[in-house]
Amino acid sequence: MIQQESRLKVADNSGARELLTIKVLGGSGRKTANIGDIIVATVKQATPGGVVKKGDVVRAVVVRTKRGARRKDGSYIRFDENAAVIIKDDKSPRGTRIFGPVARELREKEFMKIVSLAPEVL
């Protein structure tokens, strides 16, 4: 469960290392985001020579949460960290690689490029 001021790791090679959530998109007054939701965030840490710089305001999709998500069959998927992938306006990732596993819920929310780049889909 990601809310305003939440910090997330970045799971791609766009150059950002850590994000701070500014806003959760999708509805008036929406407070929290879960796996597959889009957020607006600012870059808090970045690597030198990356595509994005510290202080940039970006859009990102949440790919892993500590709280996890309940599936239709009754099972839960839960991760050790909160992580996101920085995306462009057309929902394609800014980076060319994805690090770590991503949840299957991204496939249902039509982030197919992220799913295809990920090393493992749980």
From Swiss-Prot:
Top-level taxon: Bacteria
Pfam family, any one: Ribosomal_L14
Keyword rRNA-binding assigned: yes
GO BP field: translation
CDD domains reported for this sequence: Ribosomal_uL14
Molecular function terms from GO: large ribosomal subunit rRNA binding; structural constituent of ribosome
GO CC term (a single one): cytosolic large ribosomal subunit
Keywords: Ribonucleoprotein, Ribosomal protein, RNA-binding, rRNA-binding
Coiled-coil residue windows: none
Family: Belongs to the universal ribosomal protein uL14 family.
Subunit text: Part of the 50S ribosomal subunit. Forms a cluster with proteins L3 and L19. In the 70S ribosome, L14 and L19 interact and together make contacts with the 16S rRNA in bridges B5 and B8.
Function: Binds to 23S rRNA. Forms part of two intersubunit bridges in the 70S ribosome.
Name of the protein in question: Large ribosomal subunit protein uL14
